[in-house]
Curated annotation (Swiss-Prot):
Belongs to the universal ribosomal protein uS7 family. GO terms for cellular component: small ribosomal subunit. This is Small ribosomal subunit protein uS7. CDD domains: uS7_Bacteria. GO terms for molecular function: rRNA binding; structural constituent of ribosome; tRNA binding. Keywords: Ribonucleoprotein, Ribosomal protein, RNA-binding, rRNA-binding, tRNA-binding. One of the primary rRNA binding proteins, it binds directly to 16S rRNA where it nucleates assembly of the head domain of the 30S subunit. Is located at the subunit interface close to the decoding center, probably blocks exit of the E-site tRNA. The keyword Ubl conjugation does not apply. It comes from the Bacteria. The gene is rpsG. The lineage of its organism: Bacteria, Pseudomonadati, Pseudomonadota, Alphaproteobacteria, Hyphomicrobiales. GO terms for biological process: translation.
Length: 156
């Protein structure tokens, strides 16, 4: 990481099917080894499954799931006089989105369904309904921040 200047943000084109930037970011996070067509198949397949099961617009369910998973506060380690404190800090909007995407995909990959499309659609529907592993991860993060509220004055 350069100390002179921060890296410039790359421009991302919205996905062709829904015209949504966040779906593209999600697709890029699902992608392994540069295989974008495989990632597209997985994400679009999962969103089609969500639409057929919930009878709702898949992108709205997707955004609802992301909102339900995105953390508002997290803890960061801060060393003060030989002791390390877990200090609660607010999460920036870009990081909130990145964490939500990361946690949703990790939770989907750990599910027991046979195909990734089934796992991802199941996790998206669970997250949209405030259930599932990704939502539990957010709740745990919030609990950690709440438990360490006494150290909030160490914020930097």
């Amino acid at each position: 990481m350069s100390r002179r200047h921060s890296a410039e943000k790359r421009e991302i084109n919205p996905d062709p099917k829904f015209g949504d930037l966040i779906v593209t970011k999600f697709m890029n996070a699902v992608m392994y080894d540069g295989k974008k067509s495989v990632a597209e198949t997985i994400v679009y397949g999962a969103l089609d499954q969500v639409q057929s099961k919930t009878k709702q617009e898949p992108v709205t369910v997707f955004h609802q799931a992301l909102d339900n998973v995105a953390p508002h506060v997290e803890v960061r380690s801060r060393r003060v006089g030989g002791a390390t404190y877990q200090v609660p800090v607010d999460v920036r909007p870009e990081r909130r989105q990145a964490l939500a995407i990361r946690w949703l995909i990790a939770a989907a990959r750990n599910r027991n369904e046979t195909t990734m499309i089934d796992r991802l659609s199941g996790e998206l529907m669970d997250a949209a309904n405030n259930r599932g592993t990704a939502v539990k991860k957010r709740e745990d993060t919030h609990k950690m921040a709440e438990a360490n509220r006494a150290f909030a004055h160490y914020r930097w």
